[in-house]
Amino acid sequence: MACKGGDCSFFDFVGNKTARGHFFECLWKDTPKTHIVTIPEKESEFKMDADGSFTYTPRPGWIRRWEWYDTRDKWKYRRDEDILVQVYTNAPEVELFLNGKSLGTKKRSDFMEHNILMWKVAYKEGTLLAVGKDGDRILSKDTLSTSGKPCRLALNCDRKTATDNGYDLIHVEVSIEDKKETQ
């Protein structure tokens, strides 16, 4: 979904939850939640070290204190490009899969400084699946899939009818979808 508005709120201008909103929902709610975002490593403030840990180097300037980390809600990049997959969760651990193959399990307790679980993944088309778990018990899941060639516009309205009084409003969300209805 395209970014609409500033990057310092929990919601954008039209009410869509931002990455920051998903992150804080994981911290503040008891309902199990897992959310995936991605960013090419070369554009990220996080870099993977030789030992597999991550170093954070914030952008300079005062505005960085207000903005959230650059991320995207998509899984479509150049083949073999190094992508940082970030997972927000309130589960004790997350297992990440790419096209059904496990990329490993990470514990939230190992990422306490930023509370963001991270993997460096060479991009391949398909589906990322993050499974939030407590031992063998699955608590929550999230997926990102590679979108195909755009083939249709999908409309979603928050209301079906309006009164002709000059005060009613209907929000219409337009998305571009492929044959599998992936945005």
Model-inferred region functions:
Residues 1-166, 179-183:
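Substrate-binding clefts and catalytic carboxylate motifs of secreted carbohydrate-active enzymes
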Residues 166-172:
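Short, solvent-exposed loop/turn segments enriched in Ser/Thr/Gly
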